[in-house]
Amino acid sequence: MHVKLKKKFGQNFLVDKNISRKIFNLVPNKITKIIEIGPGIGHLTDFLLNDNIKKLTLIEIDSDFLPTLNEKYKKIKYIEIINQDIMNMDLSKYDSESIIISNLPYNISSQVLVKINNYCHFKMMVLMFQKEFAERLISSKLNNLNCLIKCFYEIKKEFNISKNSFIPSPKIESSVLTFKKKDQSLLENNDINLFSIFKSMIFINKRKKISTILKKNKFKLDNLTHLDMRAEEYNLNEFVSLYKKLKPELINKFS
């Protein structure tokens, strides 16, 4: 590693080739377009080079890595290197058949995941997170982190990664998760912003009963059920159903 790592970018680069190979093996053979967020100097990228790939987009915020990436992949015509912050990009222009792969920076994992999910048209993602963060995502209990993305994706934990597989080593283990787009989403894309407001309102008071939260926010409780439960006691379908029943009032209050 010849480039100085920057703490502000939360850089921990995967250098274990066996793990990189396992990650690539999660990519279906039919995939021809890949977007990698945060390639660094290409440790994982090297394993994504394949005869099936027609387009490989590398999005790297740190300009210090560009000379290495440009030199390393200058002869590969299907690679596009973009020096930009993923948080400032319009992802709608990318083909929904593309697969997103990333070892997401630990310090902005949540923000990047929300950003990607706001487009929610990608068929599949393979993402690495800190193990504790990953456990919250795959938890069977609803929480403020997982309830929106589970409306659009099936999430599966594939394997854990030792902290020794990275440079510099993070403090805890990581996990690789796959996200596969549901055939039938539980929400429409235009519900995302309003549902995000709703879930935040509920989960910021997660220890309180739903009835208490709704009364506090002056919602009508007529024809609503399961109000004596807490948010984490709902299953996903019940929670979405509650949102849809309250949607007219939510629109009036927050739109």
Language-model segments: which ranges?
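Catalytic cores of RNA-modifying enzymes
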Residues: M1-M201, S241-K244, K253-S255
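Conserved Class I S-adenosyl-L-methionine
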Residues: N205-R207, T212-S255
